């Protein structure tokens, strides 16, 4: 069972990681191509392109300028410990045991605009480059065209290594658009999380992001290996709804918070 998640805009490079064990991203050559494009952008360009404040644009212009492919554990951090935000709050990587971290490294993949597809222990430098960014590059007019079939092929390789052919999509639409589902060699399952509000169950972004992280952690903790095992997810008030579920979209509900 392979789990796909999105990265986070919020980063933590201050707190030391739980382990010094690390790996190198598979697509650093492509990352460097993108960095070289980004290094040509002024802070004003970045503010317009990414729709961010001048201060955030300036920070990321500096990050692009300082980025080098030969970074190490001394000035970088493993992705699973560097990313913060709602999904990662739900996943709570800081409480993983060594055995759980090993399973996470095997089963979890993080889609990234800059790095393509990350394993949890892959080292990253601070960056901001969302997958939906319309960054013109030598391969096209955006990052979806830049990555092409590369990430789909990488996911296929990773799911083949798992052996059961199940892909759990816990990524956002923006990031999963970098994958081409019709070329995936496996059963694609996209869980849906709905909270009760104003008289109906609906997807509430903040809660859904956290729930995706909690489900990813549940799969690791419980060593879930089947769709039926996934349906047993009952964390933080969520429960499986057979009535609202579709064959490849198991739906989980939660009452008003």
Curated annotation (Swiss-Prot):
One of its GO terms (biological process) is response to hydroperoxide. Pfam families: H2O2_YaaD. InterPro entries: YaaA. GO terms for cellular component: cytosol. Transmembrane segments: none annotated. Belongs to the UPF0246 family. PANTHER family: PEROXIDE STRESS RESISTANCE PROTEIN YAAA (PTHR30283:SF4), PEROXIDE STRESS RESPONSE PROTEIN YAAA (PTHR30283). This is UPF0246 protein SO_3540. It comes from Shewanella oneidensis (strain ATCC 700550 / JCM 31522 / CIP 106686 / LMG 19005 / NCIMB 14063 / MR-1).
